[in-house]
Amino acid sequence: MRDRLLAAEKVKAIDWRDGALHLLDQRVLPFEENWIAYTSAAGVAEAIRSMVVRGAPAIGISAAYGIVLAARARIAEGGDWYAALEEDFMLLADSRPTAVNLFWALNRMHDRLDRLKENADPLAALEAEAIAIHESDREANLTMAQLGVDLIRKHQGNAQAILTHCNTGALATGGFGTALGVIRAAFIEGMVERVYADETRPWLQGSRLTAWELANEGIPVTLNADSAAAHIMKTKGVTWVIVGADRITANGDVANKIGTYQLAVNAMHHGVRFMVVAPSSTIDMNLASGDDIPIEERDGAELLEVGGKRVGADVEAFNPVFDVTPADLIDAIVTEKGIVERPDTAKMAQLMCRKRLH
């Protein structure tokens, strides 16, 4: 399976080369494939904030490389570069509030800095750590893909229809994808007849990114309006809803792209299984439940402007980027450490005590 998954890789969104972070600008896909090179932490923070790069794992990886760029600049300035670097950590941490992978990656970079031996090269150590974060996410993607396929096969091994939301593929990660990685692997195994992709308003990650990724790999994909999901579950034989996550709390509640919660409610009503796929770096054991997750809200103009024109002068918009799906609506959480079925606090704690499977 691993070799076939690697052979199927066609898309990547993050490239570290020649001392710069190169990001595929996801704001203009699929109409343009435009790579932007970043050489400063401020540039990387803005790329995260403006959604040049998006997807929780990809954000964390980008932030790690951002610290490498920051350290290079601070060391070149001279003086107390270590203290000055704290400003860059804070700048990157403030770029997106909900995706915990961002804070996980920054904490890991900070820990590596704190563990530097005397006379060690800090820049080389930080670069090696960022590359390790990138590579570990790629390996986690491969492990989760296999585990997800095993779970699908456990319940129903024949070709089936799957519904997904937002974008959780190579564009959102450092490798093959989380939820979309499972879907890709299931297709390779002959277990996917068709994928229904929610358009995912207002940024249209489903129509612009997911449909593009799947079509590029020859996986049958049907794009649908977000509001059609329940009807599709009822009439199109969907057996699984498979999504990613931006943060998972200690009790198994999941914050993901806005619209995920209603998918879980509809899946429960229609007897459709609901799978969340995310690396263990997405799990925040410091938060007891989804009630504690900060939910990012973006500019209402994303909803109020149609074709470049405002819909109404007196109309207000509520534009949360994420919602929280309660654990009791989730059939399984798949991570590189293993699978938690019917998640709860005890099962999540047990999962996080395990070593990685890859």
UniProtKB/Swiss-Prot annotation:
Active site: D246 (proton donor)
Pfam families given in the database record: IF-2B (PF01008)
Organism in which the protein naturally occurs: Pseudomonas fluorescens (strain Pf0-1)
Keyword Amino-acid biosynthesis: yes
Protein name: Methylthioribose-1-phosphate isomerase
Function, as annotated: Catalyzes the interconversion of methylthioribose-1-phosphate (MTR-1-P) into methylthioribulose-1-phosphate (MTRu-1-P).
InterPro entries: IF-2B-related (IPR000649), IF-M1Pi (IPR005251), IF_2B-like_C (IPR042529), Initiation_fac_2B_a/b/d (IPR011559), M1Pi_N (IPR027363), NagB/RpiA_transferase-like (IPR037171)
GO biological process, any: L-methionine salvage from methylthioadenosine
Pathway of action: Amino-acid biosynthesis; L-methionine biosynthesis via salvage pathway; L-methionine from S-methyl-5-thio-alpha-D-ribose 1-phosphate: step 1/6
Site location (Transition state stabilizer): C166
Homology family: Belongs to the eIF-2B alpha/beta/delta subunits family. MtnA subfamily.
Chain residues that bind substrate: R54, G55, A56, R96, Q205, N256, K257
Documented EC number(s): 5.3.1.23
Endpoints of the signal sequence: none
Sorted UniProt keywords: Amino-acid biosynthesis, Isomerase, Methionine biosynthesis
Catalytic reaction equation(s): 5-(methylsulfanyl)-alpha-D-ribose 1-phosphate = 5-(methylsulfanyl)-D-ribulose 1-phosphate
GO MF annotation list: S-methyl-5-thioribose-1-phosphate isomerase activity
